[in-house]
Amino acid sequence: MTPALLHLDLIDPLLPELIALQRRDRCLLPEALSELADRLHVPLNRVYSVASFYQAFRFTPCGKHQIKVCVGAACYVKGAEHVYEAFRKHLNIPEDGDTSPDGLFTVSKVACLGCCMLAVAVQIDKHIFGHVTPSTVGRVVRDFLLMVRDEEAVTQDSAQADAKEKQQPEIRICRCSSCRAAGSGRIFDAFEEERRAGKFDYKVKEVGCHGMSYRAPLVTVMLENAAYHYDNVQEYDVRGIVAQHFSTKELTWKSRAFLDAFYSRRPQGCMKLAEPPPELDKLRLVTKNSGMDDPESLDDYRAHGGFAAFDRALTMTPAQIVYELKRSKLRGRGGGGFPTGEKWRMALEAPGDRKVVICNADEGDPGAFMDRMLMESYPYRVLEGILIAARTVGASLAIIYIREEYSQAVSVLERVIAKLRESGIFGSLPPGFDLVLFRGAGAFVCGEETALLESIEGRRGIPRKRPPFPVNSGLRGLPTLMNNVETFACVPIILVDGGEVFNAVGTDESHGTKAFALAGKVRHGGLIEVPIGITIDEIVEQYGGGAEKNHTVKAVMIGGPSGGCIPRSHFDIRVDYQTLQKNGAMMGSGGLIVIDESDCMVDIALYFLRFLRSESCGKCVMCREGVPHLCTLVESLTRKGPKPPGLLDRIENLARMIQQGSLCALGRTAPNMVLSALHEFHGEFEAHLDNECPAGKCMELTDFRVTDDCIGCTKCIQACAAGAIECEPLDSARILSETCVRCGVCRSVCPEHAIVNPCRERPEQEVPFREEPHTAPVDGDVIVIDGTKHPFVSGKTMLDYAILPTLCYMECGGTGAHCMVCAVWDAVLGRFVPGCEQLLQRGHIYETSSDRVRAFRKEALSLMLVRHDFRCGSCAAKGKCRFFDYVREYGAHKTKNELTYPEPVETPHLVFDGGKCILCQRCVGVSGEKLAVHNRADRAVISPGPDAWESLDATTAEKVCSVCPTGALTFKHGDARP
């Protein structure tokens, strides 16, 4: 039996099959899903439920070509929303659709393409375009159509490898996704074409990315005794570079080169020779040998010490490998910073004959691209770390969970894994070992390790309760070691150089280097690797080159959506896990986005809230309903009109509730950026209370004006994609307020700075962070509940000790912790935990009925009321609605919303009133998969799937109605409600 067949029981085929269907049909067709359900022997409703969870899937046909506009953080601050609207306008897409009338293009937004330094990035099919603006969308479409035409006409030339390949001069070019977006693919092809035309004796070599994408396309000419670097190379430069360094006897080529030099604006002898980029002299560990090796060449990797660490690992005991990792003090690079050596020790000591290693490459942060570049440019280093992990813990299967959007990284890894398999290196690992790729389907929450496991097992990516942790009970209940891409890439370096060498870099508590995706309003964006402990100012100024021309840096956003913002005044702080956390941010996976004075902090906070609102798994009420409501409150700051008193306090209080009451890390960190911005830029938030946006970003609060300094140069008219400026030559311009989209492009191109935002500047004032202190656990085998000590008994929940209000909990089974009405305060964790599901922990101190607990329950009930239509007069549950009993008991109140409530659905056996459903999911638990949750976040609904509600027989109808705590489900043959 082949290794792949040995592991079929671990990886569910549902998600891979759905991805294959989407590729084939460009959408998920009903008949294809029905056939898939029959073939996999799973309920059709489960197929629809899973498919609706992941954003990569669509149920309506799309155009022949798909345009994906990146709206990640770096692209957003560069105007991605305006680029998206420009594509729609250029292609005449109707307001209620996303496909052009000719069916050629479908335009959509994507959370991140991982090309942040080339913002705004746009992907059309497999081609990526960088630095797209509203005024260039037409050219992008034309260029793409020309590429398609050329690809269809081109035939590949399979030249024989030269026996003297290693002695040949080399022209090295990176073709990673970012550099391709800058045109390196075309430059690569141009050098190949010149080589063939002139019969030159050089080799065009694809190499790993140098990380300096602002210099791309970067070309290095490697001769016997020298290296020459050319940056920002264009196609018309190629022949001159070749003529500069190589000679040929081909008279035709020489005459063409002579004519080029004679007529060209850039003659071959005058081309600027770039100095070796200073970034290459910086300390590099995981990006070592950048720009030198062919990423897919196993020989290149071995020539520079590749797999020496793996060979050494084969001579060491697992305990010795773990010891070396502990000595290095490597911490996980995925965000949490958990000690890697300790995690490997736990996996090694976990009982079980069968174990799994998973590389979490689901880089979902909008603004991060480190993992993509590492996988595309240093795939063998990442894989070597994974193989060492498998050897250490005794795993027979390794899985790389990677985003489907990273098409080039997927292709590179597929080819590299195949080469490793052919090399026989897997034979040194446990019997039957295999390494496989698993493609994710677009869900940020699947970056959370337990949600990722659910996805591999063919379910919706909803985080599991912890403990147990994956290292003890992970994939299919097996011990599972999970680290991210950069963490695995560090392992070979540690084993070769020794843990002490790695430990010597960094600070006393954080060691080694960290790769960052530097992007946004900075001169030199790209992948950088810096020693941990460097200051933010050093990163922005030395690596990033400072602010863009005529701008000043305002702040950096670090840690992705779950991180925070650090203002310019605090750029002297050091970048390490502890310092960032103390300043309201976090290391995260390594996204670092620079913003300048033209960016609005309220708008930035709102952007991240909108992202997280759509990415919530939808399980717990504080994340599912709390984040959208917080989003509504922050959005009201950007609207013109009177603001309710105490609005900023309400925003902060709700944000704290969400932090303390969400089940998983996504919800608990969702308000971080809002709280951080509110803390560091309080004056800017107060300006919005007065209907002013100092940055000029919020449309309703901004009205650009042209001053008398205008000289009538018309540059603003040429740059305005909305056509909102009128001007006669040499006369003052006039902005049409009703047409202006407040993108600010006119202001940035005006040479006289004559376009201004009349909002007055506000002095910034810091507001102290309000943090809940954590309480130390008590000694002994006890727990403390409401001040009284009780003996600690493993496996118990708070329901075993106290009477709590419950809505979603069922003694007969089913999933709980959706409503959080049963929440209790855990003083040791410093947050609320579900009393129905959370196992009590030794030494912890709990509150079940304090004022803070009652206030939290009131907030949870109020958020659930958002979905309620309040048509209670005719409700069958009137007078015996447990939900409204709690609403009255805790004094919950309905929050204003603009929801459109569905009309009740009536069948022969039941009535379903969606306007009263609170998504407790009790009905799902007893329906035998005839009901399921479809979609996610605040779009989640209970549905029978493609089958109508009429498909529920009387027995099932009675079951689901009997457990409904509201009037959402009513049995027509007598009320079975308890």
Residues of each region from the PLM?
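Small-residue-enriched alpha-helical segments and adjacent helix-cap loops
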Residues: A20, R24-K109, K166-Y214, T220, ...
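Hydrophobic alpha-helical positions that pack around
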Residues: P278, K282, V410-I532
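Short amphipathic, charge-patterned alpha-helical segments
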Residues: G385-L387, I532-E548, T797-I803
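Conserved phosphate/anionic-ligand binding catalytic regions in large, soluble enzymes, centered on
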Residues: S178-R180, L325-A347, G442-E454, R613-E625, ...
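Cysteine-centered iron-sulfur cluster-binding motifs in ferredoxin-type domains/subunits
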Residues: H41, C70-K78, V110-A119, C174-A182, ...
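Fe-S ferredoxin-like electron-transfer domains
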Residues: V83-L118, I124-E170, A226-R327, G461-R476, ...
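Accessory "access/gating" subregions that flank catalytic or transport cores
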Residues: D311-P351, N503-A504, E509, A517, ...
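Terminal amphipathic helices with adjacent charged low-complexity linkers/tails
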Residues: Q234, G269, L397-S411, R415-I417, ...
